[in-house]
């Protein structure tokens, strides 16, 4: 396969991140990597750009999801029921909008966010859940993929699990050519936010920033020659960008440690200081990142936590 076999298609989104890039891969099966959000504007842009390379929606044989977020999966609804929908099994409850899972998500965040110190009411949890699905789809996977698998019709591409930004996140790596279809693992012009997710009922929550940093270290070891990302331009200076992302994360983690050196704080209090201008508007994203830095510090045994009533406080360990 050559680089001409991967065709970038720029699809508008209603989100602050801007356009999402989906990829048409002309292998033995005509494959779309991600789909875009479920909007009329996105559907029109996708169809027009496919037509420019003489492809119709009905020609697409399979869609492979890098992860479940609405800007990547929502437009599945415009495809016929006969198309193959392929992705990590963790996509399924999100893209199918499974009601039992959505109810569990609501209960989980109704409990978690107050524990982290967020002034919260039950209506906010419901609104958060609804907003996550606003531009998504109601589809199901036809095939689940996992680490090390290949995909029929995409010879030479391997599935690698890269959780962090989403627990469902995978990339496709073509080792022979060094190319990677990277989803939101690494973006040229913005950081890829690790997002808090509800675990399976009965499980403990994941630690998205810890997972994300592990995925970045793995990406560094793989050392692809080019990453085709889910937003922005293709990335060729992969190692330099990974180090830049780590530098920013280390600096922010150190900021959090210094705050906790001064006094014990809740995660929400830390969030207010880290993101004073945007925490109210982007509460979930900023709390996800704040919780991530606290998870990293706990993993490094730099901080510990304790309960006061129903709220968790964090403090630095004595050095």
Swiss-Prot record:
Annotated positions binding Zn(2+) 2: 71-72, 184, 231
Key word Nucleotide-binding present: no
Cofactor binding note: Binds 2 Zn(2+) ions per subunit.
Any GO molecular function: metal ion binding
Keywords from the UniProt entry: Hydrolase, Metal-binding, Zinc
Binding, Zn(2+) 1: 67, 69, 165, 184
EC number: 3.-.-.-
Keyword DNA repair: no
Pfam families (alphabetical): Lactamase_B (PF00753)
UniProt cross-references to InterPro entries, sorted A to Z: Metallo-B-lactamas, NDM-1-like, RibonucZ/Hydroxyglut_hydro, WH-like_DNA-bd_sf
SMART domains to which the protein is assigned, alphabetical: Lactamase_B
Cofactor (UniProt): Zn(2+)
EC class (word): hydrolase
PANTHER family named in the record: METALLO-BETA-LACTAMASE DOMAIN-CONTAINING, METALLO-HYDROLASE YQJP-RELATED
Family label: Belongs to the metallo-beta-lactamase superfamily.
Protein name: Probable metallo-hydrolase YqjP
Originating species: Bacillus subtilis (strain 168)
Gene: yqjP
């Amino acid at each position: 396969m050559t680089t001409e076999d991967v065709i970038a298609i720029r699809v508008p989104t209603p989100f602050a991140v801007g356009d999402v890039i989906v990829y048409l891969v002309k292998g033995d099966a005509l494959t779309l990597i991600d789909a875009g959000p479920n909007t009329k504007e996105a559907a029109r842009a996708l169809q027009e750009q496919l037509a420019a390379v003489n492809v119709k929606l009905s020609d697409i044989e399979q869609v492979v999801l890098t992860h479940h977020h609405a800007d990547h999966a929502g437009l599945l609804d415009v495809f016929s029921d006969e198309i193959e929908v392929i992705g990590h099994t963790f996509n399924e409850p999100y893209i199918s909008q499974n009601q039992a899972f959505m109810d569990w998500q609501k209960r989980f965040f109704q409990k978690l966010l107050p524990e982290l110190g967020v002034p919260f009411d039950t209506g906010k949890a419901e609104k958060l859940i609804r907003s996550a699905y606003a531009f998504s789809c109601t589809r199901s996977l036809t095939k689940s993929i996992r680490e090390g698998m290949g995909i029929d019709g995409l010879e030479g591409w391997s599935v690698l699990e890269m959780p962090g930004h989403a627990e469902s996140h995978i990339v496709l790596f073509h080792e022979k050519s060094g190319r990677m279809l990277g989803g939101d693992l690494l973006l040229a012009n913005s950081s890829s936010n690790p997002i808090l997710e509800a675990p399976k009922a009965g499980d403990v929550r994941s630690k998205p920033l810890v997972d994300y940093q592990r995925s970045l270290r793995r990406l560094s070891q793989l050392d692809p020659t080019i990453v085709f990302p889910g937003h922005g331009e293709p990335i060729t200076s992969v190692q330099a960008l990974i180090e830049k992302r780590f530098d920013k994360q280390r600096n922010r983690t150190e900021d959090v440690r210094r705050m906790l050196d001064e006094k014990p704080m809740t995660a929400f209090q830390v969030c207010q200081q880290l993101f004073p201008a945007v925490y109210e508007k982007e509460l979930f994203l900023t709390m996800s990142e704040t919780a991530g830095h606290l998870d990293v510090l706990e993993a490094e045994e730099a901080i510990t936590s304790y309960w006061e009533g129903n709220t968790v406080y964090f403090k630095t360990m004595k050095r």
